[in-house]
From Swiss-Prot:
Name of this chain's protein: Protein SREK1IP1
Disulfide pairings: none
Biased composition (Basic and acidic residues): 59-79
Entries under InterPro entries matching the protein: Znf_CCHC
Pfam families associated with the record: zf-CCHC_3
Organism of origin: Danio rerio
Keyword Nuclease: no
Name of encoding gene: srek1ip1
Keywords (A to Z) from UniProt: Metal-binding, mRNA processing, mRNA splicing, Zinc, Zinc-finger
Amino acid sequence: MAAPGPNKDNIRAGCKRCGYPGHLTFECRNFLRVDPRKDIVLDVSSTSTEESDEEEQEALSKEKIFGSHSKGSQEDSRKEKHKKKSKERSRGKAKKRSYSSSDEEEDEMSKKKKKRKSNKKKGKKEKREKERKHKKKQKKKDTESSSSDSSSESSDTD
């Protein structure tokens, strides 16, 4: 006998507005509030973006002909325009993001490779210089020690 109320087995976290489990209610972008004081909500996901401005004008002219100038029809037309604008904005943002992110990643990778190559070259140069300096110091020590040895030998023979 399962209880009809919510329990841990049948609760699924998701959006209460559109029912999609991929996001929570406060993250929902499928519905827009037209007026925060009223409880009017727009469903963005149901609008089609393929309608042109001409089709909108035809629909408005038909409404004028039939004489349906109630507040509801005006609000509906406003809502549709608002939906289309918001959808166009979101589509434009998505295109920019996808375009720029891939290019930036490629640029970053090439920059990193260049930095690594330059760092390797610098490291090799520094090693060579250190080896040269070390060899010079050893030669000086050898020459100093040999000259001191020869001077001591010459003093012994005199």
